[in-house]
């Protein structure tokens, strides 16, 4: 108490001096230690989930329990995936349609098609880093389609070169950087063909029981990578698409092209799936996969024997492993792969730790714990005890022969009795202590579990012995490592009063924790504000405030110093050793077992961790690839072309009630249809083909108009020639028999002064008229007779049978067959 009084008096005096001479805006350097450095503790998105294992069974140790010494090796199930390289081969065809106009080329449809590379072409890739520039595709109906790179109708070889973009897991090699394009003829459509070979060196992963494997490209193969066609491994892909070759030579790395180093593959598989060809090396599963993995080696162990089980206790791991008494024989090849490894570890541990004082007490034994761990136990015995046992056998033999050695016999009995008594006593003590220790640890773990609900970070930090950030997520703890900041950049503010935006300190609001500024390691020198927490933890932000309490004295620990704040202003810093410690630690007074603290913290099993994930990436990728394969040749396009004004009119008419709604629907449908028609016409006119067709139609219409106009002018200039073209034929006479009328027309002189025309007509009830008339004088009667003669002449030509009618009068084939043997009779003769 006297020290505390002196401390506070010193603080009061220093406070008085500093309030006068010290500027509160200055900083002080905050101290830290190696155990609790300045750090930021927060829960990241990807954290480790842990729980306290309270389901611990403490078997009662009887007085006859046997304890033995030794060391053991623990193997766990190997949950790592089997990783192996896979090559994929595909050929990508690009068809670019275009239309060439004057001075411009229009790109139209572009079709990209992927095809799996055939196996014989994959052999060319693996041997020469080349592929062919042609591709052939056979349709189900037997039709074969062929395509050539750059439309040259030649099957050449193309060299593979690495793609600029590559990742750690994938490397791609191609033959064409940019698709080929050719300018077609003017005003015509054309299509350019480009071919690109794509070879990908990917990494595949398979998980036990190896029923499928996934590539880093996201593709899935539903089959075991160890399937060789006859070993019975799971393989769900079509077997007719699988090709297996033996003693296959291939380029190991395509980066150097055909100059790359080659390797001999004992057995390789090629699988054609959708638009890709896969290839991978087929290995023996027992040689490539080991289901067990070394976890840890306990160099100092204790085995306690109960009625049915063994308890293997480790001081190093602070854990106990329970296993049945029946030992195992590892016969599975995927488990015997660890034999050479653990035998080597046994020899190394014995030679380094026990060779001088202990001897191996028999051979090793293999057990399977209740947690499905494989434990290899090597019992040991002290060499001094073994020497006594061997010496007792020699003394007894000599005792049977020589009697003078009886003293030694009595002495040995006493020694043996003492040894047996001490051994039983020690075994009983160790058994009882182990049981009590187990119960105590069980209670301690239960207490830690309950305390973790109050302060999880403190509990977990004490368990691990270093600063750990923990947060309770339901029934489990999410832990993460704290981020250390630049220790030399941490500065502690002297004032704890809140400063507003104008830089004025508040008289009523204060921070409940001191302000600090710091910077991160390997970052810009920009300082970051925060507040000092417990054990040098930095709390981000400065929102932790409270109402100022005057007077008040607060002491905050930082490193090896205690910082005193009086009325929220730093007044003094004193070493932490000056403050007395409340000693609540109860020390164990038993020297042999003073450090035998058993603490059991069990991690989640791999299955539990996998089930705790919200998104199962494997199932998502498998579903995606299944959907991709199912819809490989399907392409859907959806478009909505409803004009915006139609929706506006419909919304307006909906306010008119039911009638308006119905009328609006009708108008919307009608307007939409008209809009589609108009839009289609406009689109057709905008299309080069539609524009060209309309131009041709316009030219045809203009030509028709010109032809009609010229013909009309010709008719107006020469009506007789246009109306009666046969009048210009060199016909001298035309006879027409119509009743008793006969018309004869000799040469007729035209109105322009040609040959004279004499017309004679004999008609019933009319007199014969003959004579010549002049070019310029015609009587009305003569003109009327001329018109009648022209009319009669026209009718005679019209009544003359045409060639088509003459052909129609001929008998048909059926009539000729029907009336064969008969001869047709001329009508005039008849």
UniProtKB/Swiss-Prot annotation:
Residues 98-104, 184-191 are annotated as: Involved in fusion and/or binding to host membrane. One of its GO terms (biological process) is virion attachment to host cell. It comes from the Viruses. Keywords: Disulfide bond, Glycoprotein, Host cell membrane, Host endosome, Host Golgi apparatus, Host membrane, Host-virus interaction, Membrane, Signal, Transmembrane, Transmembrane helix, Viral attachment to host cell, Viral envelope protein, Virion, Virus entry into host cell. Residues 1-22 form the signal peptide. InterPro entries: Glycoprot_B_PH1, Glycoprot_B_PH2, Glycoprot_B_PH2_sf, Glycoprotein_B_ecto_C, Herpes_Glycoprot_B. The keyword Secreted does not apply. A motif (Internalization motif) lies at residues 822-825. The chain crosses the membrane at residues 689-709. Homotrimer; disulfide-linked. Binds to heparan sulfate proteoglycans. Interacts with gH/gL heterodimer. HAMAP family: HSV_GB. This is Envelope glycoprotein B. It comes from Human herpesvirus 6A (strain GS). The lineage of its organism: Viruses, Duplodnaviria, Heunggongvirae, Peploviricota, Herviviricetes. The gene is gB.
């Amino acid at each position: 108490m006297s020290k505390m009084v002196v401390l506070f008096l010193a603080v009061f005096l220093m406070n008085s001096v500093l309030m006068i001479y010290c500027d509160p805006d200055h900083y002080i350097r905050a101290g830290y230690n190696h155990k609790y450095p300045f750090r930021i503790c927060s829960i990241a998105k990807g954290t480790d989930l842990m729980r306290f294992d309270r389901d611990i069974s403490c078997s009662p140790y009887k007085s006859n329990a046997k304890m033995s010494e030794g060391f053991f090796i623990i193997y766990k199930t190997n949950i790592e995936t089997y990783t192996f390289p896979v090559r994929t081969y595909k050929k990508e065809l690009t068809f670019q349609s275009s239309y060439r106009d004057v001075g411009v080329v229009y790109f139209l449809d572009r079709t990209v098609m992927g095809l799996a590379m055939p196996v014989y072409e994959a052999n060319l890739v693996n041997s020469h880093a080349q592929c062919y520039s042609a591709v052939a595709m056979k349709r189900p109906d037997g039709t074969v389609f062929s395509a050539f790179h750059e439309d040259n109708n030649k099957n050449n070889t193309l060299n593979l070169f690495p793609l600029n973009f590559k990742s750690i897991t994938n490397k791609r090699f191609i033959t064409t950087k940019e698709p080929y394009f050719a300018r077609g003829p003017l005003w015509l459509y054309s299509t350019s063909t480009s071919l690109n070979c794509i070879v990908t060196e990917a990494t595949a992963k398979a998980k036990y029981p190896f029923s499928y494997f996934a590539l880093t490209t996201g593709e899935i193969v539903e089959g075991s990578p160890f399937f060789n066609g006859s070993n019975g491994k799971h393989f769900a892909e079509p077997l007719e698409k699988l090709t297996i070759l033996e003693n296959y030579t291939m380029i190991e790395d395509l980066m150097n092209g055909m100059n790359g180093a080659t390797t001999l593959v004992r057995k390789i598989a090629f699988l054609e799936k959708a638009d890709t060809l896969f290839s991978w090396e087929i290995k023996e599963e027992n040689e490539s996969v080991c289901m067990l993995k070394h976890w840890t080696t306990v160099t100092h162990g204790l085995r306690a024997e109960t009625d049915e089980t063994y308890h293997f206790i480790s001081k190093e791991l602070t854990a106990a492993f329970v296993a049945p008494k029946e030992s195992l024989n590892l016969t599975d090849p995927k488990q015997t792969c660890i034999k050479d490894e653990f035998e080597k570890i046994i020899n190394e541990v014995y030679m380094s730790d026990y060779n001088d004082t202990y001897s191996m007490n028999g051979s090793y034994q293999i057990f399977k714990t209740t947690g499905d761990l494989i434990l290899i136990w090597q019992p040991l015995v002290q060499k001094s005890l073994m020497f006594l046992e061997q010496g007792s056998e020699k003394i007894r033999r000599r005792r049977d022969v020589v009697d003078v050695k009886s003293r030694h016999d009595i002495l040995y009995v006493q020694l043996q009795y003492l040894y047996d008594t001490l051994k039983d006593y020690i075994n009983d003590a160790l058994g009882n202590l182990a049981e009590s220790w187990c119960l105590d640890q069980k209670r301690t773990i239960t207490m830690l579990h309950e305390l973790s609900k109050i302060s999880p970070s403190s509990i977990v930090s004490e368990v691990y012995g270093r600063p750990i950030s923990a947060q309770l997520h339901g029934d489990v703890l999410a832990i993460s490592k704290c981020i250390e900041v630049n220790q030399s950049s941490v500065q502690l503010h002297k004032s704890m009063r809140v400063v507003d935006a104008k830089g004025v300190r508040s008289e009523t609001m204060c921070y409940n924790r001191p302000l600090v500024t710091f910077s991160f390691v390997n970052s810009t020198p920009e300082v970051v504000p925060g507040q000092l927490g417990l054990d040098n933890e930095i709390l981000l932000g400065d929102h932790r405030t409270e109402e100022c309490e005057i007077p008040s004295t607060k002491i905050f620990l930082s490193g090896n110093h205690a910082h005193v704040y009086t009325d929220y202003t730093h007044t003094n810093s004193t070493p932490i050793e000056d403050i007395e410690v409340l000693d609540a630690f109860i020390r164990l007074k038993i020297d042999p077992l003073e450090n035998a603290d058993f603490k059991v913290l069990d991690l989640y099993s791999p299955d539990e961790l996998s089930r705790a994930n919200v998104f199962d990436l494997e199932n998502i990728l498998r579903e995606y690839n299944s959907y991709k394969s199912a819809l490989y040749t399907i392409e859907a396009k959806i478009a909505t072309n409803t004009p915006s004004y139609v929706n506006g009119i419909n919304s307006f008419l909906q306010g008119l009630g039911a009638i308006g709604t119905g009328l609006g629907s009708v108008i919307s449908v009608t307007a939409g249809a008209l809009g589609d028609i108009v839009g289609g016409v406009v689109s057709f006119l905008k299309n080069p083909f539609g524009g060209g067709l309309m131009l041709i139609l316009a030219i045809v219409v203009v030509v028709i108009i010109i032809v009609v106009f010229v013909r009309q002018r010709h008719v107006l200039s020469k009506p007789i020639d246009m109306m009666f073209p046969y009048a210009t034929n060199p016909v001298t006479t035309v006879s027409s028999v119509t009743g008793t009328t006969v018309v004869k027309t000799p040469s007729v002189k035209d109105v322009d002064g040609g040959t004279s025309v004499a017309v004679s007509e004999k008609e019933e009830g009319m007199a014969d008229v003959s004579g010549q008339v002049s070019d310029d004088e015609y009587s009305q009667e003569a003109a009327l007779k001329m018109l009648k003669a022209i009319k009669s002449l026209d009718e005679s030509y019209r009544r003359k049978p045409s060639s088509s009618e003459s052909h129609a009068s001929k008998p048909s084939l059926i009539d000729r067959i029907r009336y064969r043997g008969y001869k047709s009779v001329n009508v005039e003769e008849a």
